[in-house]
Amino acid sequence: EALRQELQTISIENEALTAEVQGLQAEMAQQSALPQAIEEQKAEGFRLLSALERQIKAGESDRKIAYLTFDDGPYDNTTAAILDILKEKGVHATFFLRNRPDHVAEIRREIREGHSIANHSYSHKIRAVYESAASCIREIRDQQAWLTETVGVTPEIYRFPGGSPTAGKNKAAIAAALAADGLGYVDWNCYTGDGLPGELTAEKAYRTAISTVGDQKIVVMLMHDYSAATLAALPDIIDTLKAEGYLMMPLFKDSVMIRWA
């Protein structure tokens, strides 16, 4: 009788363990499928946004679009705070990522909350990235592979560290490799100034952002995850852009690619 009861107990425990394992497997499968499902939903939104861009460029719409972008992250504290603000304000952005294996949770959150993730090179070490066209292409492809393997999303947009002119004579070869790999690239046409030398206050970041937007109807704003000044100015920047009629969305491959000569 004691043996029978023990066997029953083991059987019940096994059933509970099996159910727990199956539940965990289902949860893992759901989490694995989530990035792809989100990207599919965003693709439909991007199709509509692309049509709006064409109307704006043709002068057939009074709407305006602001693409908020954040480079070099993720970073401790500031990236999460940026995401909190974006969520509170109900807007979306694009995060140009370097290789930050200790910050995968933030990248997953960026995807989960509907933002675009993009490629900003593997190391972001300027000398290493731009040693040659081949070194830059290798950095891009290494980061593509890492993001695909780590978070299940393959970026479709690249931003040259320092902007595309930083590539110098190698820019054409790198751009050709990007196109062959199915990536677009983008620079920017407005900014907070958080990547420039000198002290930056929140007030100055705000004034710089709004003044460089000017009367442009489609803007790509450069900001950086690490900047406390940008973080402090961000709510006011978003509020002002909203008041001026800007729709704030994440970049996508077929969106207007602001590129410098």
Where are these regions (language model features)?
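Catalytic domains of cell-wall/extracellular-matrix polysaccharide-remodeling enzymes
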Residues: 81, 124-247, 252-261
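Active-site beta->alpha N-cap acidic-glycine motif
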Residues: 39-131, 135-154, 240, 256
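N-terminal pre-catalytic segment of deacetylase/amide-hydrolase enzymes
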Residues: 1-68, 75-82, 88, 204, ...
